[in-house]
From Swiss-Prot:
Disulphide bridges: 63-105
Organism of derivation: Dichelobacter nodosus (Bacteroides nodosus)
First-listed, main subcellular location of the protein, grouped into a coarse class: other
Protein name as it appears in the record: Type IV major fimbrial protein FimA
Highest taxon, organism lineage: Bacteria
Residue span(s) of the pro-peptide: 1-7
UniProt family annotation: Belongs to the N-Me-Phe pilin family.
Modified residues (N-methylphenylalanine): 8
Membrane topology note: Single-pass membrane protein
GO term, biological process aspect, one: cell adhesion
């Protein structure tokens, strides 16, 4: 009388492990890129928050206002987020009048200087995203950006 075999053979288990390993080899790098892109997107949110400050400073004809002085209530030129630090920079160019022209004001986001500490993706730590403000108030990625192109949010990618 034959005995019935129950369960999986060793070769079947090895095949399943190999398939899982192959899938993981593709999924883990894609997941790491996804995390880095989502963390880099915070920089654009920080820059959007600085738009009001830039607009207030432009009333005085400059991009940067006076440095932060909490005693006098003056709002500073930077904003710290979870994954990065955004700073207003640049020199206002009043001669630019077309909506799509850069007005000279910039926001420089440095990743890895936020409140998250070492919980930021290594793919963007220490990288910079420099956003040029256009006359119409929107931003595009500008010169000085060393963040990899695939991590730059679509909202600020320059049209090619």
């Amino acid at each position: 009388m034959k005995s019935l075999q129950k369960g999986f053979t060793l070769i079947e288990l090895m095949i399943v492990v190999a398939i899982i390993g192959i899938l993981a080899a593709f999924a883990i790098p894609a997941y790491n890129d996804y995390i880095a892109r989502s963390q880099a997107a915070e920089g654009v949110s920080l820059a959007d928050g600085l738009k009001v400050r830039i607009a207030e400073n432009l009333q005085d004809g400059e991009c940067k206002g006076p440095d932060a002085n909490t005693a006098s209530g003056v709002v500073g030129n930077e904003d710290k987020g979870k994954y990065g630090l955004a700073k207003i920079d640049g020199e206002y160019d009043a001669s630019k009048t077309e909506a799509g022209d850069p007005n000279g004001c910039k926001v420089e986001i440095t990743y890895g200087q936020g409140t998250a500490g070492d919980k930021i993706s290594k793919l963007i730590t220490g990288k910079k995203l420099v956003l040029d403000q256009l006359v119409n108030g929107s931003f595009i990625a500008g010169d000085g950006t060393d963040l990899a192109d695939k991590f730059i949010p679509n909202a600020v990618k320059a049209k090619k």
